[in-house]
Amino acid sequence: LLMVLGFFFATYNLVSMIVGHKVGSDLGSIVDGKVEFTNTKSKFHVAVTATDAAYSQWQCRIMYYWYKKAKDMPGSAMGKFTRILHSGKEDQLMNEIPTFVVDPLPDGLDRGYIVLNRPWAFVQWLEKAVIDEEYILMAEPDHIFVNPLPNLASENEPAGYPFFYIKPAENEKIMRKFYPKEKGPVTDVDPIGNSPVIIHKYLLEEIAPTWVNVSLRMKDDPETDKVFGWVLEMYAYAVASALHGIKHTLRKDFMLQPPWDLEVGKTFIIHYTYGCDYNLKGKLTYGKIGEWRFDKRSYLMSPPPKNISLPPPGVPESVVRLVKMVNEATANIP
């Protein structure tokens, strides 16, 4: 195990040096230690990290279906699409979805927390892939593009979504293990994860190796691991960004999350991470399996059936729209 760890960190340090060289030579002018950019209208590359598990595959297929529908709509700044497959080998979707295969972390290093592979996957992809666009959207398999997505970022300030449960200030004791006082107040750390985020490619090249390092350090610290749990990697991205002095524009309209967000409106992405449980009167029964339900975790081993029944009257429009979009995708995917 020590040899594996040594090899991994040697590889990580080499990538850091290469990425650091690219950042230093290609970013442009630096004023008072901060990078200054001018272009704000470029397209962004849509990148989603994934595994070869059936659960990940069916979500990616639905996401890619709606990407293709939204890409060329008026107001969209979407460029090309890549599924970054961190299972280390090809799968059966290679010819259906543009895919770039990267290596997972060495055996045992993720300690069962598979999301820890995400920052390492981005480091490898950024170094090895040819990416034409100047910006990148970091997305997830359970994202559906519900409105044309413009480039919400500027070249020196990425755009992110503020998560109500990412609370750096309330976890200052833990945050100081990774964001020391000399770096500034913990309020420098944005209440975000890495997804959804639209970011200039060179800024992500700067952040990504630090994101790997902070993620591994957090997972290795028992207190941090216990307190942050499944959102540990999200905190790691937020801290890594702050360590590089990078602030995100916080866009609540970036994403909605049924069943808590009731209307689609002018938001851009539906994130169906939460289960939607209702009784037949249209009342939410969250925490209790409903008489009607849609929960992605019901389909761990195989995709959802075609033509899922629509929710009963009274259920919010966001949930109805989600089910209709899933149904349209599954009806048109072979």
Swiss-Prot record:
It is found in: Golgi apparatus membrane. Pfam families: HPAT. The keyword Membrane applies. It catalyses: trans-4-hydroxy-L-prolyl-[protein] + UDP-beta-L-arabinofuranose = O-(beta-L-arabinofuranosyl)-trans-4-hydroxy-L-prolyl-[protein] + UDP + H(+). One of its GO terms (cellular component) is Golgi membrane. It is a single-pass type II membrane protein. The chain crosses the membrane at residues 1-18. The keyword Glycosyltransferase applies. GO terms for molecular function: hydroxyproline O-arabinosyltransferase activity. Its main location: Golgi. Keywords: Glycosyltransferase, Golgi apparatus, Membrane, Signal-anchor, Transferase, Transmembrane, Transmembrane helix. Probable glycosyltransferase involved in the O-arabinosylation of several proteins including extensins and small signaling peptides. Catalyzes the transfer of the initial L-arabinose to the hydroxyl group of Hyp residues. Probably involved in the arabinosylation of CLAVATA3/ESR-related (CLE) signaling peptides that move from root to shoot, to interact with receptor kinase signaling that regulates nodulation. Involved in long distance nodulation signaling events. This is Hydroxyproline O-arabinosyltransferase NOD3. The gene is NOD3.
